[in-house]
C-alpha cells in the first residue's frame, strides 16, 4: 500500500467517518442530560447548545490512531493519546463546573512535562534564529512549559463563533501534516491528518447544523491545544526530522506562522486586559472575531475571513522561505505579517465600528455573509447535517 494512503487517506477517512456517525448520538445525550452552554451577556448564541463536541472529535482521533498504530508502532502515538485524554477530561470538567485558572495551568504544565519525558522532545534548539543554537536544559524546559501553556490557552480562547476554532484547527493540522509527511515524520503526519479528519464533520455540523449543532467546548479546545503543542515541540526539537529535511526552514517561524491568529490575538487580548486593570483570565468581547460580529458579519463570514488571514500569514512565511531568506528574516516577516493581520486588523475594524465609518469591501463581505445563511445551499446543508436527530 502506498505510504500516502497509510499516512494521509486512511487516518483522515477513519476519523471523519467515526465523528460523522457518533455525533448525533452524543448531541442527543447532551440534550437529554442538560449538558448545554447557556446564553449570557458575553456569549453570542441565543439558545442553549450542547457542549460535548470535543467528545465526538476525541473519539474519531482515538479510533484513527488505534487503527494506524498497527502499522506505526510509536511512543509518540501513545503520548498523544494519553495527553489528549487528560486534557479532554479536564476541559469537560471545566465545561460542567469550572476549574480555577491556576489549577488548569498546573495540569497543563504537568501534561507538557509528560510529553517531554515520554516522547523526549522539547523546545531545546533555536536552529540559528538570531544566531542561537542549542539551549541549556534550565532554559529549554521553562520555555517549553510557557510556550505549551500559551498554545493550549490560545486555542481555547479563540473559540468564540461557529466553526472558528475547528476551522483553524483543520487548516493548522493540514499545514503540519504536509510538512511532517514530506519530512518523513509519518507518526506525526498520521496524528495531523486524523485530527483534520475528525474536525471536518464537526465543523460542518457546528456551522450548518441546527438540531445537530454542538459546541466543541473546553474539552475539544484543550485537546486540540495539546495536539498542536506536541506538533510544535516535535518540529522544533533538535532531533526534528523537519529541520533535517529542510535545514534552511525556520522551524520556529513556521510554528509561529501556523498558530499566528490564535497566538497573536490572545497576546493582544491579555495585554489589553492587564493594561485596563482586569484579570487576563476573565473573558470579555475584545477578540478579533467579536469586532467582525459587531460589524455585521455572520458567524460563517467571520470564520472564513479569519481563516483567510491565517492563510495569508502562512503563505507569507513560505514565500519568504522559498525566496531564500535567512531563518531570522523568516521569523521577522512572520511577526510583522501576523501583527498586521491580528493587531492591526483589530484596531482598523474597531475604528470603523466606533466611528460608524464604512468601507466598501468590508460592507460588501458583511452583507453577503448575512445573505448566505438565507440561501438554498445553506438550508440544504442544514437539512443534511440534522439527519439522524
Briefly describe each language-model feature range.
Residues 2-29, 33-34, 58-74, 78-89, ...:
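Alpha-helical transmembrane segments
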Residues 38-52, 213:
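Juxtamembrane helix-capping/reentrant segments at transmembrane boundaries
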Residues 44-50, 130-141, 251-255:
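Short aromatic-rich membrane-water interface segments that cap or initiate transmembrane helices
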Residues 49-66, 113-118:
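A generic, lipid-embedded transmembrane alpha helix
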Residues 63-75, 93-99, 116-130, 236-239:
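Transmembrane alpha-helix boundary signature
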Residues 82-90, 107-122, 143-153, 169-175, ...:
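Membrane-embedded alpha-helical core segments of multi-pass
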Residues 97, 125-135, 297, 318, ...:
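Membrane interface segments of multi-pass transport proteins and intramembrane proteases
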Amino acid at each position: 500500500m502506498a505510504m500516502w494512503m497509510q499516512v494521509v487517506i486512511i487516518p483522515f477517512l477513519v476519523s471523519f467517518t467515526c465523528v460523522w456517525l457518533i455525533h448525533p448520538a452524543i448531541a442527543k445525550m447532551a440534550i437529554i442530560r442538560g449538558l448545554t452552554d447557556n446564553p449570557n451577556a458575553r456569549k453570542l448564541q441565543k439558545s442553549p447548545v450542547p457542549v460535548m463536541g470535543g467528545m465526538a472529535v476525541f473519539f474519531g482521533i482515538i479510533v484513527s490512531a488505534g487503527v494506524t498504530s498497527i502499522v506505526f508502532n510509536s511512543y509518540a502515538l501513545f503520548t498523544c493519546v494519553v495527553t489528549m485524554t487528560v486534557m479532554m477530561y479536564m476541559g469537560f470538567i471545566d465545561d460542567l463546573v469550572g476549574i480555577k485558572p491556576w489549577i488548569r495551568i498546573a495540569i497543563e504544565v504537568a501534561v507538557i512535562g509528560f510529553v517531554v519525558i515520554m516522547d523526549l522532545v522539547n523546545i531545546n534548539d533555536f536552529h540559528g534564529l538570531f544566531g542561537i543554537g542549542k539551549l541549556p536544559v534550565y532554559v529549554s524546559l521553562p520555555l517549553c512549559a510557557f510556550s505549551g501553556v500559551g498554545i493550549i490557552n490560545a486555542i481555547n480562547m479563540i473559540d468564540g463563533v461557529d466553526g472558528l476554532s475547528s476551522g483553524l484547527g483543520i487548516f493548522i493540522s493540514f499545514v503540519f501534516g504536509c510538512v511532517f509527511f514530506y519530512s518523513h515524520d509519518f507518526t506525526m503526519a498520521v496524528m495531523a491528518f486524523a485530527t483534520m479528519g475528525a474536525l471536518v464533520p464537526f465543523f460542518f455540523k457546528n456551522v450548518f447544523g441546527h438540531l445537530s449543532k454542538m459546541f466543541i467546548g473546553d474539552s475539544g479546545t484543550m485537546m486540540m491545544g495539546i495536539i498542536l503543542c506536541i506538533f510544535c515541540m516535535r518540529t522544533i526539537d533538535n532531533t526534528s526530522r523537519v529541520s533535517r529535511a529542510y535545514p534552511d526552514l525556520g522551524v520556529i517561524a513556521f510554528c509561529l506562522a501556523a498558530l499566528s491568529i490564535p497566538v497573536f490575538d490572545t497576546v493582544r487580548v491579555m495585554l489589553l486586559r492587564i493594561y485596563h486593570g482586569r484579570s487576563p483570565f476573565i473573558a470579555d468581547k475584545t477578540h478579533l472575531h467579536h469586532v467582525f460580529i459587531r460589524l455585521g458579519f455572520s458567524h460563517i463570514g467571520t470564520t472564513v475571513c479569519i481563516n483567510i488571514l491565517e492563510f495569508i500569514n502562512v503563505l507569507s512565511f513560505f514565500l519568504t522561505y522559498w525566496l531564500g531568506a535567512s531563518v531570522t528574516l523568516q521569523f521577522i516577516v512572520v511577526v510583522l505579517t501576523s501583527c498586521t493581520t491580528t493587531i492591526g486588523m483589530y484596531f482598523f475594524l474597531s475604528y470603523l465600528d466606533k466611528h460608524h465609518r464604512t468601507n466598501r469591501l468590508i460592507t460588501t463581505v458583511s452583507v453577503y455573509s448575512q445573505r448566505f445563511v438565507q440561501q438554498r445551499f445553506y438550508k440544504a446543508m442544514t437539512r443534511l447535517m440534522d439527519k439522524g436527530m
